[in-house]
Structures are given as C-alpha cells and as structure tokens.
A protein has these predicted regions:
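Short beta-strand segments that buttress and anchor functional surface loops
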Residues: 50-53, 177-185, 194
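Right-handed parallel beta-helix
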Residues: 62, 129, 190-210
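N-terminal type II signal-anchor transmembrane helix
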Residues: 1-28, 95, 312
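Transmembrane beta-barrel wall of Gram-negative outer-membrane proteins
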Residues: 232-245, 251, 261
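Short structured motifs
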Residues: 32-35, 124, 176-178, 191-193, ...
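Flexible, solvent-exposed coil segments and beta strand-coil junctions
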Residues: 50, 141, 159, 172-175, ...
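Secondary-structure transition motifs
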Residues: 30, 50-166, 227-233, 249-250, ...
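Short extracytoplasmic
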Residues: 26-50
C-alpha cells in the first residue's frame, strides 16, 4: 500500500498537469497554465498553484489564482459524486474590460462555453447535480473592471467569500467556516458577517444581505449588447436572509424581499416597451439546491406595456 501511495504521489502531478491544461484551454478557447500541482493520495488532497488564464490577443492574464486547495473524500468514489471536505481559492485576480456598446474582452470565452452541444448527446438532466461541497472559502480576491468607453477603472479588493456548504447529498461533515461576504469597493468597505452563534454548535447560521435605494442607472450600460431589451432605469432594494442548516437535514434557504422601483425598458431600437412603478417579490422559503420556490407575494404596481402587431401577425 505504501508503494502505491508513493507511486501516486510521484506520478499523478506529472500525468494530470498536462491534460488539465489542455482540456481547460480547449473549453475556454484561451491558454490555461498551472505552475505546479501536488497530490497526496493518502488524504486525497489536491493543490494547484499559480493558475493562469491568458488574456485576449496578447493582453495581460484574464485570471490568475495563487492557490487552489481541494480536500476530497473517499466517498466521492463510493457515491460516484464529488464529496469535498474543503475547497479553498486564494488570491484570485480577475481582469475585465468593457470595450463599449455592451461588448467585453471575455465575449469569446462566454460564446465558447455557451455554444450549442452535439444534438446527438443525451439531453441534460433536470435533476439537481449530485455533489457535497463543504467549507468553501475564497480569500484575497481582486477584480479590476476597466471601462474603455469612459476611460475609468473600478476595483474590488480584499474579496472574501465563505460558504459552509453546497450539497444535494445527505452527507454531514464538520463545518468550520461561517457564511460571510466582505470586500472593498472604490475605497468603501462592505462586510456581511454571520448573524448567529457558531455553526459548529448549532448547525445553523444566517447571513443577512441588505441594500437600500441602489440606483442601477450607472451600471446599465454594461449589460450585454445581445440582450433583446434595454433596461434604461431601475432602483433596487434587497433585504434577504441566507440560511445554512445542517439539522434535521442539509438545506440552503433564502427568505426576505427583493424590490425594483421606477423601472423603464425599451427594445433594441429604443422604443418604449415596459415600465412600472414597483415590482415586489416576498420570498417565504426558496431552496435553490432543491429547486423549491415558495413566495408569499408578488406585486406589480402600475405596469405600462407598449406592444404592436406587425403585418405578419
């Protein structure tokens, strides 16, 4: 057994690194490189360092990641589904550029990923993917968004995101992280921390996200040009609780209210299409991993729809 472990420890990095870079490059249409790969067969721990996705047309790297750590479980083999005890991404840096008129420097990657698949392939299943991911952590993240149309760069720094679990299986593992989102945007700090006692004691944790009077107008120009409608004005209010529960069973639940106000939409030619004073959605129990949506109320106030029937009907 020790010999098998030693052979795996020595051979897996060399056997996996090349195919991983090749397959990832083919899927994205960009050159993907991995600085080093380390695998510990006795604990099923995999570490990637210095991962990079090339930029378009010789531009600087689109994405770099300092370290990716995966602590897999033997149950992954027994259950034929990924079961991961810890997943960590350290120091990811993403560079995005708005070229103008709704075009971005990652349009080629998006087109590659969303291209129609072979029709002969089996249709995708409507069932949730089978997986169990625990202790997800992204830290030291950075996003630089350059708008060539106006000559400005917006930066998100010190991005931290921790999620206790994302699971559609019944496995229960030790949870060591609390739900949290924190970042610095243009010098302003945002930090959403857990609103409960430690998860390890109660098997329950809540994260509360709230934004009031968020004017979306400055960001509407960044919507993709391929959209059939144009959003011209909108104000967003969010008051949502995200709950992670491990007893009596695994669950990720959303509740609260999302509201949009003073919304105006046009078609591609700029003709009025839809406007309304307010759309309010009250969520009682939304469980995305279980495809369950329970709403207490959906209210649309003063909608105005502009429609025309052409000669073709």
């Amino acid at each position: 057994l020790l010999g098998v472990w030693a052979l795996s420890w020595l051979s897996v990095p060399a056997l996996v690194k090349g195919p991983l870079e090749r397959i990832a490059s083919e899927q994205l249409g960009r050159t993907v490189t991995v600085g080093s790969l380390d695998f510990k067969p006795w604990s099923l721990e995999l570490t990637l360092r210095d991962l990079s996705v090339a930029g378009a047309n010789g531009a600087p790297a689109q994405l770099t990641i300092g370290r990716v750590y995966v602590d897999a479980e033997l149950q992954s083999l027994l259950r034929l589904a990924p079961v991961v005890d810890a997943f960590t991404v350290e120091n990811p840096a993403l560079r995005l550029t708005h070229l103008g008129q709704g075009r971005y420097d990652v349009d080629d990657v998006i087109a590659k990923l969303t291209a129609p698949k072979d029709e002969a392939q089996t249709p995708p299943s409507t069932e949730p993917a089978r997986l169990a991911l625990y202790n997800l952590l992204l830290q030291g993240g950075r996003v630089d968004f350059t708008d060539n149309a106006v000559g400005k760069t917006h930066s998100v720094q010190d991005l931290l995101l921790s999620v206790p679990f994302i699971s559609t299986l019944s496995d229960k593992k030790e949870v060591r992280v609390e739900p949290r989102l924190a970042f610095t945007l243009e010098g302003s700090r945002f930090d959403s921390s857990a609103q409960s006692t430690p998860f390890a004691q109660t098997r329950h944790a809540d994260a509360h996200i709230r934004w009031d009077d968020l004017d979306l107008a400055p960001y509407l120009g960044y919507l993709p040009a391929s959209l059939p409608i144009r959003l011209k004005a909108a104000t967003l209010d969010v008051d949502v609780k995200l709950a992670f529960e491990q007893t009596p069973r695994l669950a990720v639940k959303l509740s609260g209210q999302v509201q949009t106000r003073d919304v105006k939409m046009t078609d591609r030619e700029g003709q009025d299409l839809l406007a309304f004073d307010r759309l309010t959605v009250d969520m009682a129990d939304v469980r995305p991993l279980e495809q369950v949506v329970n709403l207490t109320q959906v209210e649309l106030l003063k909608p105005v729809l502009h429609a025309q029937r052409d000669a073709a009907g």
